[in-house]
């Protein structure tokens, strides 16, 4: 269900020739048909969320094709022209290097980088936002970047919730409870849901849910009897908050609305939204 202000609406793309129009329409249809409530104050916030999701998906595919390597934190490496490898295996932005240039270099020179899946997901989030922000804004918000597991800049606002419906552009986690301790890095896999039943995970590539579970199961202890599984934990960029920084030069998606109800009362507690 999509709510704009106090109106429950069914949105649709009005310009079928705009970039990724079919993908955007699919996302809107999924959101409108889900039981989960997606609440926005304005249509511009919805447009930002839609474009953010598309950019997360395209950034995930770009990272997959960049040559970016999978390594444990003990074996991680980065381009020393832009980053310093920390003692724990993270990547610390060098002084006087614009974050926008350093993030873009990961996608341009992926073979010069290697790390684990959690860091890869954060890199994808930064790249998606860079596509929607002015470079000056991005550099101001995300100065002094550190790329390491789930350590991310405090100005990157994320929402993690349990339960809810899966939408393309969501970050979801596969858990492998009986992982072989010799390959503990395969205790789980952070992935971006690409839509059409495919996920991208750094280390496993672009695969279906069943294929990722199979890959994780291959890395269990001998005689394991518990299968890996897709958890119900979903992580998203808080598009409502992050939309404040969007570039005015970013083209807006043209969205029309079929009104369903215009007297909804929306209440949000934590990450749960209810409509009365």
Curated annotation (Swiss-Prot):
Residue intervals passing through the bilayer: none
Highest taxon, organism lineage: Bacteria
Gene Ontology process terms (BP): sporulation resulting in formation of a cellular spore
Leader sequence residues: none
Enzyme Commission number: 2.3.2.13
Family affiliation: Belongs to the bacillus TGase family.
Summary of the function given for this chain in its UniProt record: Probably plays a role in the assembly of the spore coat proteins by catalyzing epsilon-(gamma-glutamyl)lysine cross-links.
Entry protein name: Protein-glutamine gamma-glutamyltransferase
Organism, scientific name: Bacillus cereus (strain AH820)
